[in-house]
Regions:
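HotDog/MaoC-like acyl-thioester-processing domains
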Residues: 2-86, 154, 161-193
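Catalytic strand-loop segment that frames the active site of acyl-thioester-processing enzymes
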Residues: 56-121, 135
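Mixed-charge, polar/low-complexity N-terminal
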Residues: 4-5, 22-24, 30, 66-67, ...
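Small-side-chain structural scaffolding
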Residues: 33, 91, 95-98, 111, ...
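A broad, low-specificity signal for short, low-complexity segments enriched in glycine/proline
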Residues: 1-4, 14, 89-91, 120-124
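Catalytic-pocket segment enriched in acidic/His residues
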Residues: 109-159, 163-165, 173-176
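Broad hydrophobic/π-residue packing in well-ordered secondary structure
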Residues: 8, 40, 57-59, 94-99, ...
Length: 193
C-alpha cells in the first residue's frame, strides 16, 4: 500500500443508509514493480458522496501504465513546521483503534520476522493525523491525497511540514534532519461539488 486519494463531496451523517462499491482501477508504472488501483465509492440515495483510490504495489520488475504526477510535490523552504514525537507503543495503540493488527506495527521482534529493522507506525496513522489537523481549514468537499515514501521506525522524532496553496494545502512528514521523506501529499478544496 503506497498511496491513498480520498474525495469527499459531503460528510456521511449518523443514521444515513449508504451503499459501498469497490472495483479494480488502472495499472500504474513504478520502478519497483507493478502498481494498481483499488477504487471504493460510497453513495447515499444513489448519489456519490465519497470516493477512495488506494494504490498498492506488487514488487518485481518495472511496471506498465501511467505515472503518478504528484510524486514530485516539493514544499517551499518557508513552510510551517511542527515536530512530532512518536512513542514506542504507538503502533499497538493504533491497532487497537483501527483493528489492523499487522505484526510489522506492533513490536520490534514481530516486525523483524517480516524484514523490518524495528516496528513501524502505520502510514494511515500519519494520513489520519494530518487530515484531522487540516480538514477543519477547508470546506466539507475536499480531496485528500497522500503518498507513503519510507517507513517511520518507532520510536521516532519527525517533522510535519505544510503550506497553504491557492487550492488548499501541500504537506509532508520528514525525518528530524528534514532530508528523508516519509509521506507527502495535498489537501485541496473541491469546487462546485
Amino acid at each position: 500500500h503506497f498511496a491513498n486519494s480520498i474525495k469527499q463531496y459531503r460528510p456521511l451523517y449518523i443514521g444515513e443508509t449508504f451503499s459501498v462499491t469497490c472495483k479494480l482501477g488502472n495499472l500504474i508504472a513504478h520502478d519497483k514493480g507493478q502498481a494498481f488501483e483499488v477504487l471504493s465509492y460510497v453513495a447515499v440515495d444513489g448519489k456519490r458522496i465519497w470516493e477512495d483510490t488506494s494504490i498498492y504495489l506488487y514488487k518485481g520488475k518495472e511496471g506498465i501504465g501511467s505515472v503518478l504526477e504528484w510524486e514530485q510535490l516539493v514544499l517551499q523552504e518557508n513552510c510551517i513546521k511542527e515536530s512530532w514525537s512518536l512513542y514506542q507503543n504507538l503502533g499497538f495503540e493504533f491497532a487497537l483503534a483501527s483493528g489492523d493488527f499487522n505484526p510489522i506495527h506492533l513490536h520490534p521482534l514481530t516486525a523483524k520476522v517480516f524484514g523490518f529493522e524495528r516496528h513501524i507506525i502505520h502510514g494511515m496513522w500519519g494520513a489520519g493525523k494530518i487530515l484531522a489537523l487540516l480538514e477543519k481549514r477547508v470546506p466539507q468537499a475536499f480531496e485528500f491525497t497522500v503518498l507513503f515514501k519510507t517507513p517511520i521506525y518507532l520510536p521516532a522524532s519527525v517533522i510535519f511540514r505544510h503550506e497553504k496553496t491557492e487550492e488548499g494545502f501541500n504537506f509532508d512528514v520528514v525525518d528530524h534532519t528534514q532530508e528523508k521523506p516519509h509521506l507527502k501529499g495535498y489537501l485541496k478544496v473541491l469546487e462546485n461539488s
